[in-house]
Swiss-Prot record:
HAMAP family: Dephospho_CoA_kinase. This is Dephospho-CoA kinase. The gene is coaE. Catalyzes the phosphorylation of the 3'-hydroxyl group of dephosphocoenzyme A to form coenzyme A. It is found in: Cytoplasm. The keyword Coiled coil does not apply. GO terms for biological process: coenzyme A biosynthetic process. Belongs to the CoaE family. Transmembrane segments: none annotated. Residues 4-204 form the DPCK domain. Its EC number is 2.7.1.24. ATP binds at A12, S13, G14, K15, S16, T17. GO terms for cellular component: cytoplasm. It comes from Staphylococcus saprophyticus subsp. saprophyticus (strain ATCC 15305 / DSM 20229 / NCIMB 8711 / NCTC 7292 / S-41).
């Protein structure tokens, strides 16, 4: 029986890497970030509603969403973040549910890759939750390097989410990403073996 697994983790925890590894093992990935971009692509009703809510500046010269502008607005105005979520979330859910149903009908196990799964109370929409976690200091370092932001900004983004300790208590399974990519792969494959998804480790993990 195909399973639906919610994959989540703190910001900059390495969740995308785990998604790639799971895809290589034959899981089908339904990615919330990709669906969020599709929801406001050029010419969509979603983007038209963003324009109505955020004004002409929300659209760039190419007719696409001005992510820098919208991002700045929602960061500084919490009520605008709620407004954006009310526009985007229903469209994202529709895109993801359609994709999930297609994969399940084909007999695949499905990974619902949702960064804010717990924050949006979506744990009941999946069979179980797998959490990718790392240390807070690693999260902050990765964010500073990846997004070219200050330590204060990185900390603010980390602290804006539910704490990793609380998420660990809420998850069904954990995937430790505090060390190297090879060790991450080993930790993931240990879980896949325990749960019966694979029969042996990859050659580079042995």
């Amino acid at each position: 029986m195909p399973k639906v697994i919610g994959l989540t983790g703190g910001i900059a925890s390495g969740k995308s890497t785990v998604s790639e590894l799971l895809s290589a093992h034959g899981f089908k990935i339904v990615d919330a970030d990709i669906a969020s971009r599709q929801a406001v692509e050029k010419g969509t009703k979603g983007l038209e509603r963003v324009k109505e809510s955020f004004g002409e500046q929300a659209i760039d010269e190419n007719g696409e969403m001005n992510r820098a502008y919208v991002g700045e607005v929602v960061f500084n105005q919490p009520e605008k973040r709620l407004e954006l979520n009310e526009i985007v979330h229903p469209i994202v859910r529709e895109i993801m549910e359609k994709e999930k149903a297609q994969y399940l009908s084909e007999g695949y196990h499905v990974i619902m890759d949702i960064p804010l799964l717990f924050e949006n109370n979506l744990q009941d929409t999946v069979d179980e939750v797998w959490l990718v976690y790392t240390s807070e200091s690693i999260q902050i370092d990765r964010l500073m390097e990846r997004n070219n932001i200050s330590m204060e900004e990185a900390k603010a983004r980390v602290y804006s989410q539910i704490s990793i300790d609380k998420k660990r208590r809420m998850a069904d399974h954990e995937i430790d990403n505090r060390d190297t990519k090879l060790e991450l792969k080993q930790n993931l494959e240990n879980l896949l073996l325990e749960e019966g998804y694979i029969e042996s480790h990859s050659e580079d993990v042995l």
